[in-house]
């Protein structure tokens, strides 16, 4: 059941929109939801520290959707048009997308899901003594990992999968504080055909933007791939009249390999520039690993794995 956090009822009287809901799940995690934003939040620490951290997360979430809505038109513009934002989460989106804009078409909306997670996590852990914490927004995850700690994040071989079929272990020393997954059949539209591209980066917003762009480039021209204009599927899409993937038919192993190689080149470019820490690219059970992250992979349903230079699910 959804209820308000202790000491702060969700009501119009304290400036909180009536649609904002919050409550503790049976396992002690915090659930925050407002409109399309649905967060699952967990942390490890002393009970009083966790209570305060969760209250701070609630405060950080309150009003965030409304601030984004006010900036939506600007944040839907390409980075090259120099979009502006009046809120912190919008600034995170712009900063994340700007890292990739020199060679790629990208709007700040590419980082919206986990810019929200980054923002809530930042507020949540401020002045709090927690060993580990995370904010999961639809499988894209912002992480807080104290020195000497590590976290395990569930990952999926297809973005629409409901249950993780693999896991990656992330230590504090790696510097990865964000995990994001993108693919053609997920809730966001894609220009490519990747089943899943999972990226580790220094922030969740950077991981989200990078995963989107790498997944776009896992692609090839083929009659089995169906596409449509983005704005014909979603009115006002930030992708405009770009062709997005709507269906992927049967491909040979060589064709899948060709598509993965294209995305791998983009991932390597991002790795070399320092924009990401590593990436896992999957299509039809073939996988490519970019960066020194093979040791992080606990398991995954893939074959023909190669290494150069999520929907996430569970987090432990």
Task: Annotate each predicted stretch with a short phrase.
Residues 27, 36-38, 148, 194:
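A general secondary-structure signal for short beta-strands and their flanking turns/coil
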Residues 34-47:
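Generic N-terminal amphipathic, Lys/Arg-enriched alpha-helix
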């Amino acid at each position: 059941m959804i209820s308000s956090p202790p000491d702060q009822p969700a009501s119009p009287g304290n400036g909180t929109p009536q649609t904002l809901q919050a409550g503790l799940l049976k396992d002690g995690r915090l659930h925050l939801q407002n409109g399309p934003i649905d967060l699952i939040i967990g942390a490890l620490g002393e009970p009083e520290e966790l209570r305060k951290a969760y209250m701070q997360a609630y405060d950080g979430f309150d009003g965030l959707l409304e601030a984004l809505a006010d900036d939506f038109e600007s944040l839907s513009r390409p980075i090259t048009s120099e979009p502006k934002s009046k809120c912190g989460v919008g600034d995170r989106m712009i900063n994340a997308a700007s890292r990739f804009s020199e060679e790629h078409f990208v709007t700040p909306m590419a980082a919206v899901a986990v810019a929200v997670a980054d923002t809530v996590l930042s507020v949540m852990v401020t002045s709090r003594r927690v060993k580990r914490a995370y904010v999961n927004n639809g499988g894209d995850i912002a992480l807080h990992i104290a020195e000497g700690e590590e976290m395990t994040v569930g990952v999926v071989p297809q973005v629409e999968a409901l249950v993780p079929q693999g896991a990656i272990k992330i230590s504090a020393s790696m510097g990865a504080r964000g995990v994001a997954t993108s693919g053609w059949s997920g809730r966001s539209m894609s220009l490519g055909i990747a089943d899943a591209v999972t990226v580790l980066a220094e922030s969740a917003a950077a991981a989200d933007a990078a995963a989107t762009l790498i997944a776009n480039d896992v692609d090839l021209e083929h009659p089995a791939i169906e596409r449509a204009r983005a704005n014909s599927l979603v009115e006002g899409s930030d992708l405009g009249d770009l062709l997005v993937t709507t269906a992927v038919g049967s491909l040979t192993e060589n064709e899948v390999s060709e598509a993965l190689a294209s995305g791998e080149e983009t991932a390597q470019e991002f790795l070399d520039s320092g924009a990401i820490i590593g990436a896992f690219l999957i299509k039809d059970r073939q996988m490519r690993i970019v960066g020194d992250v093979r040791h992080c992979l606990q398991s995954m349903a893939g074959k023909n794995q190669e290494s150069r230079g999520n929907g996430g699910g569970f987090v432990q």
